[in-house]
UniProtKB/Swiss-Prot annotation:
InterPro entries: Cyt_c_III, Cyt_c_III_dom, Multihaem_cyt_sf. Participates in sulfate respiration coupled with phosphorylation by transferring electrons from the enzyme dehydrogenase to ferredoxin. This is Cytochrome c3. Heme c 1 binds at H26, C34, C37, H38. Its cofactor is heme. GO terms for molecular function: electron transfer activity; heme binding; metal ion binding. Keywords: Electron transport, Heme, Iron, Metal-binding, Periplasm, Sulfate respiration, Transport. Its main location: periplasm. The second heme binding site has an unusual CXXXXCH motif. GO terms for biological process: anaerobic respiration. Heme c 2 binds at H39, C50, C55, H56. Heme c 3 binds at H29, C81, C84, H85. It is found in: Periplasm. It comes from Desulfovibrio desulfuricans.
């Protein structure tokens, strides 16, 4: 899979932004299966962004499976950044560890 080595995850257009964007390293996560995070990917086609319709398109709520916020912050799901980092006891789990203060 051809993924950008490093990228910045930003809130989708129209979302209420309260924290800084997050620097993300695909390279640093290369040992993981892509489907861990991109759970709707079929393994062959183009990978859609998290906020794609039918996935985490809800930018209004911080609750629910379709919530853009919960895609990254759900502590009880290993599919989210925070949940995976907590489960593995590795990686950032606090707000400012991912969202630098301006």
């Amino acid at each position: 899979v051809d993924a950008p080595a490093d990228m910045v995850i930003k809130a989708p257009a129209g979302a209420k932004v309260t924290k800084a964007p997050v620097a993300f390293s695909h390279k640093g996560h290369a040992s993981m299966d892509c489907k861990t995070c991109h759970h709707k990917w079929d393994g062959a086609g183009a990978i859609q962004p998290c906020q794609a319709s039918g996935c985490h398109a809800n930018t209004e709520s911080k609750k629910g499976d379709d919530s853009f916020y919960m895609a990254f912050h759900e502590r009880k799901s290993e599919k989210s950044c925070v949940g995976c980092h907590k489960s593995m006891k590795k990686g950032p789990t606090k707000c400012t560890e991912c969202h630098p203060k301006n």
